[in-house]
Design a protein with these regions (language model features):
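PLP-dependent class I/II
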Residues: 1-166
Length: 166
């Protein structure tokens, strides 16, 4: 199974699945009953793009772009953030997880980030029924430029020091 959502266009929601025919039929029936079928025009556009481009070369370029942006995020975090805040070292994908100390009011931290136009997502958004609000945030480096990432991380870093100390 795989997706073209992040490699061709964010939000595309078109993917692929290989496997035994009976398994694929069951998955397709479940998908059609729960989320409906993807518009045929979207699927045809993806098929045309895949017939037109060198997808492997495209993936290599996407990986380079995201690695550059990830490195910018990590470098800026290490430069600006409180030493009490932890950041995962991504091994792929487009997101890093930042974990705050347990004694920090993460709702207030989140609001302070939003007030300063720094977009982060609370970890509870990725948990069933909002459970596990916890003290972690997802940071994305897909859309912003390297300069925007650096500026955002400088602001975020200052806020981590304000909320957590050095």
């Amino acid at each position: 199974a795989g997706s073209y959502s992040k490699t061709l266009s964010a939000g595309l929601r078109v993917g692929f699945l290989f496997g035994p025919e009976k398994v694929i039929e069951a998955i397709q029936a479940l998908k059609n009953n729960t989320a409906g079928q993807m518009p045929l025009v979207t699927q045809k556009v993806v098929a045309k793009v895949l017939d037109t481009i060198d997808y492997d070369a495209h993936l290599e370029n996407v990986r380079k772009v995201y690695k550059t942006k990830c490195d910018a995020l990590l470098n800026a975090f290490n430069k600006y953030a409180s030493s009490k805040v932890k950041l995962t070292q991504p091994t792929g994908g487009m997101f890093a997880w930042m974990t705050m100390p347990e004694d920090v009011n993460c709702d207030d931290f989140f609001e302070a980030c939003m007030d300063r136009n720094v977009g982060i997502i609370k970890c509870g958004a990725f948990a069933a029924d909002g459970a596990g609000e916890g003290h972690a945030f997802r940071l994305s480096y897909t859309v912003p430029t390297v300069e925007e990432i650096t500026k955002g991380m400088e602001i975020l870093g200052a806020l981590t020091k304000e909320f957590c100390g050095e």
